[in-house]
Amino acid sequence: MAQVTGKTLYEKVWDSHIVASPEGEAPVVYVDRHLVHEVTSPQAFSGLKVAGRKLRAPQKTFATMDHNTSTRSASLDALSPMARTQVETLAQNCKEFGVRLYDIHHPNQGIVHVMGPELGITLPGTVIVCGDSHTATHGAFGALAFGIGTSEVEHVLATQTLRQLKAKNMKVEVRGKVTDGVTAKDIVLAIIGKLGMDGGTGYVVEFCGEAIEALTMEGRMTLCNMAIEMGAKAGMVAPDETTFNYLKGREFAPKDAMWEQAVAAWSELKSDADAVFDVEVVLDANDIAPQLTWGTNPGQVVAIDGVVPNPETETNSTNRTSMIKALEYIGLTPGTKMTDISINKVFIGSCTNSRIEDLRSAAVHAKNRKVAEGVVAIVVPGSGQVKLQAEEEGLDKIFIEAGFEWRLPGCSMCLAMNDDRLDAGDRCASTSNRNFEGRQGRGSRTHLVSPAMAAAAAVAGHFVDIRKPY
């Protein structure tokens, strides 16, 4: 008889959601929460109308407007014709199909991966999907969360299920404690730098270790948000007291006796001691410094006290070619100190780093300082709740007095899809998740950093090591 081993966190959630496993076919997986937005949902709703179908579970579908909305005005008149069509179509579809919508006038409107968790829509042990690649964010709660395509969006709307092949298991353990100035963003960039853009392809990654357990829920969301950037299907962190304390009392979280039952069940959501992972990776938290990307993918990253790498020292020919191409686009010379790189734009926001703790850490470096001459810096809260809390704490005043622009919630400059974008030649310190060619605008050059690093760069006019006086 084959020896039975324990299960990983991923396997526990996966196994509990299998509806059917037809021989020779991909298993059918039940979906607990479906998040939709204005960009990837119109064709899906159209498909339902053509087929004469209704939503299988409208109460498990939640919609918001975020990708194409303006961060300057809540008026529809501020939108481009295409963006206006998209948000109006979403509103019409939600009304017709009975979907709860957080539109641009709703106080809880925001980036889908920010407002979902803060409303308690995201819960441990659930399967969550969205037509957006950074759905992995919700894995911070011990949920299995991943992005899907528009045709799959339609399938979930109609059936509340998906056909999915099971992924392999990877464990990434970060041992020890991080030093001052090192954040969740730095941890995940260091992980991606170690594994590369495709190091997680075919895997669901469980993040664990002392450094991960010490993170707040907002830090864990930053971590899981970027699991996709190393090719992983999803990222997960086992729920614990930090998770439960964050969720308690939130609008869609269980209440009263149901809460106690839920916590008891959630407490079992952790990998068994004898669980087997296909790959295990270990990092020492003490070795991680504030990180900064130098190239055109998140894996092209070094510590702030490092230099732009030389492609000639790379033994892998494919990597060497990629490095040369990246340096040509980004306009940097090998050997350049990272602290000598000047910037003219700063973006603090996105589903990676637009939560209240992110804004607090950025405000520390903005307080009683001024944005450097020639630098344009914007701060975009991730949701209406984040914006309100930041304003109650006076963070908006700190940013405005320092010369930052304080905006309305939205995806903003993370992607060149709305009216917040970079011009050709701009060099931006960005707290977003992707630094691909043209991601923030045609010909733009993006460097991924933490909110603290971005704010410090804004006032210095160049990248600085925030662990030292500047």
Swiss-Prot record:
Class of the enzyme per the UniProt entry, highest EC level: lyase
One molecular function GO term is: metal ion binding
What CDD domains does the record tag this protein with? Answer: IPMI
**Cofactor binding description:** Binds 1 [4Fe-4S] cluster per subunit.
- Does this entry carry the keyword Isomerase? no
Q: What is its EC number?
A: 4.2.1.33
Pathway info: Amino-acid biosynthesis; L-leucine biosynthesis; L-leucine from 3-methyl-2-oxobutanoate: step 2/4
Q: Which UniProt keywords apply?
A: 4Fe-4S, Amino-acid biosynthesis, Branched-chain amino acid biosynthesis, Iron, Iron-sulfur, Leucine biosynthesis, Lyase, Metal-binding
Binding sites annotated in the UniProt record for [4Fe-4S] cluster: 351, 411, 414
List this protein's GO terms for biological process.
L-leucine biosynthetic process
Checking PROSITE patterns in the record gives: ACONITASE_1 (PS00450), ACONITASE_2 (PS01244)
Instruction: Name the cofactor(s) required for activity, per the record.
Output: [4Fe-4S] cluster
SUPFAM superfamilies cross-referenced by the UniProt entry: Aconitase iron-sulfur domain
Similarity-based family: Belongs to the aconitase/IPM isomerase family. LeuC type 1 subfamily.
Q: How does it assemble?
A: Heterodimer of LeuC and LeuD.
The UniProt entry, under NCBIfam families, shows: leuC, PRK05478.1, PRK12466.1
Q: What does this protein do?
A: Catalyzes the isomerization between 2-isopropylmalate and 3-isopropylmalate, via the formation of 2-isopropylmaleate.
Q: Which PANTHER family match?
A: 3-ISOPROPYLMALATE DEHYDRATASE, HOMOACONITASE, MITOCHONDRIAL-RELATED
Instruction: List the protein's name.
Output: 3-isopropylmalate dehydratase large subunit
Its source organism is Shewanella frigidimarina (strain NCIMB 400)
From which lineage does this chain's organism come? Bacteria, Pseudomonadati, Pseudomonadota, Gammaproteobacteria, Alteromonadales
